[in-house]
Amino acid sequence: MSSMILTQFGPFIESISGITDQSNDVFEDAAKAFSMFTRSDVYKALDEIPFSDDAMLPIPPTIYTKPSHDSYYYIDALNRVRRKTYQGPDDVYVPNCSIVELLEPHETLTSYGRLSEAIENRAKDGDSQARIATTYGRIAESQARQIKAPLEKFVLALLVAEAGGSLYDPVLQKYDEIPDLSHNCPLWCFREICRHISGPLPDRAPYLYLSAGVFWLMSPRMTSAIPPLLSDLVNLAILQQTAGLDPSLVKLGVQICLHAAASSSYSWFILKTKSIFPQNTLHSMYESLEGGYCPNLEWLEPRSDYKFMYMGVMPLSAKYARSAPSNDKKARELGEKYGLSSVVGELRKRTKTYVKHDFASVRYIRDAMACTSGIFLVRTPTETVLQEYTQSPEIKVPIPQKDWTGPIGEIRILKDTTSSIARYLYRTWYLAAARMAAQPRTWDPLFQAIMRSQYVTARGGSGAALRESLYAINVSLPDFKGLPVKAATKIFQAAQLANLPFSHTSVAILADTSMGLRNQVQRRPRSIMPLNVPQQQVSAPHTLTADYINYHMNLSPTSGSAVIEKVIPLGVYASSPPNQSINIDISACDASITWDFFLSVIMAAIHEGVASSSIGKPFMGVPASIVNDESVVGVRAARPISGMQNMIQHLSKLYKRGFSYRVNDSFSPGNDFTHMTTTFPSGSTATSTEHTANNSTMMETFLTVWGPEHTDDPDVLRLMKSLTIQRNYVCQGDDGLMIIDGTTAGKVNSETIQNDLELISKYGEEFGWKYDIAYDGTAEYLKLYFIFGCRIPNLSRHPIVGKERANSSAEEPWPAILDQIMGVFFNGVHDGLQWQRWIRYSWALCCAFSRQRTMIGESVGYLQYPMWSFVYWGLPLVKAFGSDPWIFSWYMPTGDLGMYSWISLIRPLMTRWMVANGYVTDRCSTVFGNADYRRCFNELKLYQGYYMAQLPRNPKKSGRAASREVREQFTQALSDYLMQNPELKSRVLRGRSEWEKYGAGIIHNPPSLFDVPHKWYQGAQEAAIATREELAEMDETLMRARRHSYSSFSKLLEAYLLVKWRMCEAREPSVDLRLPLCAGIDPLNSDPFLKMVSVGPMLQSTRKYFAQTLFMAKTVSGLDVNAIDSALLRLRTLGADKKALTAQLLMVGLQESEADALAGKIMLQDVNTVQLARVVNLAVPDTWMSLDFDSMFKHHVKLLPKDGRHLNTDIPPRMGWLRAILRFLGAGMVMTATGVAVDIYLEDIHGGGRSLGQRFMTWMRQEGRSA
């Protein structure tokens, strides 16, 4: 497809398609062209695409003609602007309405307008119609703002990337077969809709996304539904090309988006129909099954370690066909209700044709699920609060009043004689609390400091209401006047409260909480309740007891939100027959945990459980106290309680009263109100861990008590007896997965399972839980999907263009967007898009964002990142220095390890290229021979790109001037907060004096608790908004790095480059080549597939794996466990005395006996590769996390040369730690080369092992000196 408009990109297109070498000159010329391209040029380039008929479909004209907004809103009895609900109680999203009548034109861009100032002013004065218009205008604008950058940039990058035609895959030795843009339906729709809206106007973009806000085209055909629609179309257009999605499925996705735009509310329609693709593909697959293979995994004991073993494959046959009940009726009803019957019918027809579980069938599921809308859903804060915080659970079997004792302060104890199932809840929490309080570490001052510090962050925490509540009792707080920090942070709060007694701060426990919002993809927006410091403080016993339950009593894998942090093999195991899994989710979990049932029982249980171990002791700065005890009728006594119990008393008062939620809706002028709610606060440190503990405890009660009492079906009884929460029920928060292990006889009968599930639903109703149960032959856990042991990445949940913008703050200044763009690239890697197409598109996208106009002094200048910066950040080259194309894999690490890897792969080529291009010198270098690499790397901007990539991409705000007195007062207050226990301070002081004797001079700036107050101060500064000067300073620093000429890479990279390897034979595959493990990673996607089968999948929890590579698992917020770890390892490596290690551990707060024991262990213990490599800041790249990198380090990388030992490759006896670094270097090369991961042998260390080791030791000694 030759486009006249794109000719200026010609050389760049050839270089990212592997036809010519990539070079920085070509890259920067293209970046200039990208920045000169106007929005209208993008539409002209679209006009040139000769779309074929199969890309077209009827666009309903109703998407352009929408009613006025005023019939969709009203003012309620409390004088709040509210949305009228026409379609159902949850129809409170942005209505699809016309907008032109609310706009006033922009001064210079006259075709565009934004919400008229006159209307906003009338709204401020309380005019009802104007308030309604402003609410609609602002929330529609918010919906349009949920993108990373203007859509045209993403579209232009797609046009440029795809102009290179189909790509040659050197591994498969053929061209890929992805249809070109003329078959791209979403792109055609995008063009047609924009054409139709702009009509005769000279400007073609329907709306402008600018830093000042959103400007709408002044066209009568423009509606509020157009921005989310276009955002979805662009996402789909890019995915169709880069993931090789089936165009006919994408067309169905486009139809749903068009229906949503034609409906009365885009977001609402999307939310109601989001299940169409999964329901008719994933959840109804294989009703007949004729073959295929699934993995046979064994879950190793103890199960809580989450380690699995691959035992080969299991052939699938008809007996493993889907046995779960059919969803046909439900699916067709949904289709009829929303006018999508044809889409449902088409999907079901196609799903039935897949009777074999193989690469094609799972790719079909992935392609279909990728077609769901990926916008961030938006609604006003008022509606969110009134939707989410007004539900109260219906408890069918409440706890009888007579089963409680009289009050002990704020709590009552549940009597043993009660018949309520609450007694099991009480028992579990009581036991856990008693054991938690009996652990000596609970009372350790460091542990308490860690607990007190974990919520001291740069996030907000309802500070204004806290201050008001304290002023009300005449407590004045220090205001640290003139300090350049953001006051709305919990760091500032902690400093203000540091020296107040608990008797004062406890008043703030009942203070209002302010409001936070999160917008999500394919889920309702949530409101967040940021608790203040005293509220978080008294939640600690609740958190700690729940943590004890989750750690010792159930099977809860703690995991982060990124795909790579979740336990992928668990889903593989659960979904591989003969195992079966049931996805159990608790609907409205926060709202279902209230004082009426759960919290009253839990508070009493903890209060009584900790009693014997905590007598008289304060805890986390909360003193012991006395309460009235009327638990025995007619007797009133004073009962002394400990600090921990005192916390529970205050927390109970809060839970019993509920939370007072202060809503200040910035989208609706005049919507200011306080809402009382009993819903559990989403911002508490206890929320997630608490829900997990209740989830598992209630399930245990069901399996062991309630279930067996309520059925006499022998099969159901047998099933319940075989399940335990230590082995079969995995839960996190409100999400649960019941895993029914296959028996020797095969799968458990589906009818038995359904009977069991009906019982679970009935059981939940007794205490107000609505279990949302899905039993359909697939496993879904924490938003990961599996079928027959294969993960189905959900591409629609990682939108390429979308970005959550929950508040109206301005977007972050360039170059912070580059981190988001690299994030988009890595999401694509984790999701297994087509590797060559995705790398090519990512190069085009990065190029489009690599240049920025800036003011330098009085003149306009341009800041430009060289292409090498992106390589440093992890984007692999396509072809360079005369290499073959596509020899670099997307598994190339980031940073120095990645630079080492790609340079080592083509080092002889680079030397030859440099000499051929006239870069010759008489001085021979060890790495590049007679090539004048210094001059070359400066001229190609390779050095500049390398160094610019390491500079901050956010302006630095911690350099602001402040009077010394106030600054010291602030850090002293933070220090008092942290070192509230004098014993902690004396440990650190003792560590410091020991350090002076044994450690000084070995390494610089060892981590210490004394650094924390200053780090918190910096954190509170960095949370502030950057000034113009700070932005200019960042630009200036980048500019200087670009102009500077360099003579080398970093000392570490220069040392790495002395190591040479020999790549040898391919290994035996780790898994069967016929086995689909991740949809899209299949023989059509060569490099990721070959890496997966040669390295093998990761078969254990990555989080557990990395937790085992740390000496200290937890530390105070503000210190980094990795930094402590590398300091300890460096000391050991540099031959420090054991006493120096003890001193280091004392400085981070350990008690002497513990520090001494740990230091001894560190000196002697064998340390794993991943941990040892931290001494030079090497870490496992994120892109390797789904692969078995551990066995790669152990088995693929050989430190003994192929032809026997050499003097140069011998590792001196005292330098065993060098092996870890070498293993990383070798693995980096193996993973950076495309194709099968081969065995690699060490060949040469220039200058020998000892000299390399000494280089690293010198570096370790100097590191931190500059810090």
From Swiss-Prot:
Q: Which InterPro entries does its entry note?
A: DNA/RNA_pol_sf, RdRP_5, RNA-dir_pol_reovirus
Give the catalytic activity.
RNA(n) + a ribonucleoside 5'-triphosphate = RNA(n+1) + diphosphate
Which EC number(s) does the record attach to this protein? Answer: 2.7.7.48
Spell out the molecular function terms from Gene Ontology: hydrolase activity; nucleotide binding; RNA binding; RNA-directed RNA polymerase activity
Could you tell me which species this protein originates from? Reovirus type 3 (strain Dearing)
Q: Name the protein family.
A: Belongs to the reoviridae RNA-directed RNA polymerase family.
Q: Does the keyword Hydrolase apply?
A: yes
Asked if Ribosomal protein is a keyword of the record, the answer is: no
Question: Any idea what job this protein has?
Answer: RNA-directed RNA polymerase that is involved in transcription and genome replication. Following infection, it catalyzes the synthesis of fully conservative plus strands. After core assembly, which consists in recruitment of one capped plus-strand for each genomic segments and polymerase complexes, the polymerase switches mode and catalyzes the synthesis of complementary minus-strands.
- The residue ranges of the RdRp catalytic domain are 555-792
User: GO biological process: what's one of them?
Assistant: viral genome replication
Q: Which Pfam families match?
A: RdRP_5 (PF07925)
Q: Which UniProt keywords apply?
A: Capsid protein, Hydrolase, Nucleotide-binding, Nucleotidyltransferase, RNA-directed RNA polymerase, Transferase, Viral RNA replication, Virion
What name goes with this protein? Answer: RNA-directed RNA polymerase lambda-3
CC per GO annotation: viral nucleocapsid
Q: Tell me where in or outside the cell this protein is found.
A: Virion
